[in-house]
Design a protein with these regions (language model features):
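N-terminal loops that bind phosphate or other acidic moieties
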Residues: 2-146
Length: 146
């Protein structure tokens, strides 16, 4: 089973994980890593390494998906430092609740997907999770029904 590390600016990762756990239940193989004011990429790398150790102790197979908030941000840059030397790691940016729920579901299914397949699922879930609604949409639907 692959591990998931959600790395973000501030406490967003912790709260996002808590919100997803309301739907998916407690997740032992998902770790939240924060970048708080005063910390830099070196601090985040250390937190990532500790999270990876915990994931391995929980039985993860060595594949790790980093879900970061911003491309080019410090949590992303810190993850890059680890991913560059390990082909079983990957990063997807733009983490959202629909994305994390989809990836937790894929993790629970444990279908043997490699990290690149999981990354593609994450990107698709992120795209599909962004939807729109406006009052004119309802009016247009009502007109179509007449």
């Amino acid at each position: 089973m692959f591990g998931i590390i959600v790395g973000t600016h501030g406490r967003f990762s912790e709260e996002l994980l808590k919100s997803c756990e309301m739907i998916c239940g407690e997740q032992k193989n998902v770790k939240a890593v924060t970048l708080i004011p005063g910390e830099g990429p070196d601090d985040v790398v250390k937190k990532y390494e500790a999270a990876i150790q915990e994931l391995q102790e929980n039985g993860c197979d060595g594949n790790v998906l980093f879900l970061n908030d911003l491309f080019g941000g410090s949590p992303y840059n810190a993850a890059c430092r680890l991913v560059i030397s390990n082909e079983s790691y990957g990063i997807v940016t733009g983490v959202s609740m629909p994305m994390l729920i989809e990836i937790i579901s894929a993790q629970m299914a444990d279908d043997g997907s490699d990290i690149k397949d999981v990354m593609a699922k994450a990107v698709e879930a992120g795209r599909n999770g962004a939807q729109t609604f406006h009052a004119s949409s309802v009016a247009d639907e009502e007109e179509d029904e007449l």
